[in-house]
Amino acid sequence: MPTINFGGVEENVVTSEEFTLKKAREVLKNEVITVLGYGVQGPAQALNLKDNGFEVIIGQLEGDAYWEKAIADGFVPGKTLFPIEEAAKKGTIIKMLLSDAGQVAVWPKVKKCLKKGDALYFSHGFGIVYKDQTGIVPPKNVDVILVAPKGSGTNVRRNFKDGSGINSSYAVFQDATGRAEERTIALGIAIGSGYLFPTTFEKEVFSDLTGERGVLMGCLAGTMEAQYNVLRKHGHSPSEAFNETVEELTQSLIRLVAENGMDWMFANCSTTAQRGALDWAPKFRDAVAPVFDSLYRRVKNGAETRRVLKVNSAPNYLEKLRKELDTIKNSEMWQAGAAVRALRPENRKKKK
């Protein structure tokens, strides 16, 4: 396994050049891969596996919208598409790709279907790490493994189709067969991962929950809203406030940072922007550090898990969620955003 230097720290990384798709096919040649859940990660991983020549079946609540989506994607009821319990019985590798709350709901049925030597696969460590709250405690005679793509289901599929793939982390929680790591890496390669980073279930879930609530979404949304509100309070128009807060970030700067790094970005902007950004970055870092410390503590002690399971399991959850999302969508900031997005250069081209 090659090592790569990340900021002065040597880390092991599995590559698709070292562990080829051909090798993955050999490792998984006698496996039936059951994908439980056809919502977010399910379609991408299932279709990538199918396109790479692996035997895949889907387990989904019969007749719901996701069942119909699976049919539209080419899975056939009674052949490659089954109710959840039936699909779990047929598989040798059971991919638990339902929502976290969904996994808790179906676990008692899935557990009864597991056979000695099966592999129970996750793309998120939530159910296993917070077992005291989820009740997900696998039997000792199955492998318990994880491959967590570093991107949404949409990107897992999109990148696979354009040939680039997506990187993933992987972990083994329980090795009952002596083949758990080999199976895990093979499954990571099979869904299109070019590089696989070793982790643990615990580290994956702690970093993932912190990231989602932090920079990736929660902190990002909150910070953008705060700046937009300050600009509006001081008389800037909605379009100007949105452009200076969101549009320049998403359409220009973040792409350049992704390609070249933050040091390059600082070196390739106006001297006024450069000096100001360098001066203010530490202030923002120090201001939000206590919030991140608090967030990480809540993730680690299970407080965030308790909230997720309580709220997401409520009978009126979807109704309340729609109201929350509608409030955001109908806010001045994001209504301004919709108008600004319509004026992007690529949309002007479509009108001609």
Curated annotation (Swiss-Prot):
Q: Which residues form the KARI N-terminal Rossmann domain?
A: 11-199
Query: Please, one GO biological process term?
Result: isoleucine biosynthetic process
Q: Which InterPro entries match?
A: 6-PGluconate_DH-like_C_sf, 6PGD_dom2, KARI, KARI_C, KARI_N, NAD(P)-bd_dom_sf
Name the SUPFAM superfamilies on file. 6-phosphogluconate dehydrogenase C-terminal domain-like (SSF48179), NAD(P)-binding Rossmann-fold domains (SSF51735)
Instruction: Write out the residues that bind substrate.
Output: 270
> What name is this protein filed under?
Ketol-acid reductoisomerase (NAD(+))
| Domain KARI C-terminal knotted per the UniProt entry, residue ranges | 200-347
| Positions annotated as active site in the UniProt record | 124
**Pathway involvement of the protein, from the record:** Amino-acid biosynthesis; L-isoleucine biosynthesis; L-isoleucine from 2-oxobutanoate: step 2/4; Amino-acid biosynthesis; L-valine biosynthesis; L-valine from pyruvate: step 2/4
Q: Which cofactor does it need?
A: Mg(2+)
PROSITE patterns registered for this protein in UniProt = KARI_C, KARI_N
Taxonomy of origin reads:
Bacteria, Pseudomonadati, Thermodesulfobacteriota, Desulfobacteria, Desulfobacterales
Disulfide bond sites: none
Sites where the protein binds Mg(2+) 2:
208, 244, 248
Q: What highest taxon heads this organism's lineage?
A: Bacteria
